[in-house]
Structures are given as C-alpha cells and as structure tokens.
Curated annotation (Swiss-Prot):
Enzyme class: oxidoreductase
Annotated catalysed reactions: 2 a phenolic donor + H2O2 = 2 a phenolic radical donor + 2 H2O
Name the UniProt record assigns to this protein: Peroxidase 8
Gene Ontology BP term (one): response to oxidative stress
Length: 15
C-alpha cells in the first residue's frame, strides 16, 4: 500500500 501525502488515505487499499 502506498500512503499519500494525506497520511491517512492509502492507494489500492481494500480494508
């Protein structure tokens, strides 16, 4: 999972 600059939001997250 790659964490964006927002810190909380992640890309490709399926949780």
């Amino acid at each position: 999972e790659l964490v964006t600059l927002s810190g909380a939001h992640t890309i490709g997250q399926a949780r």
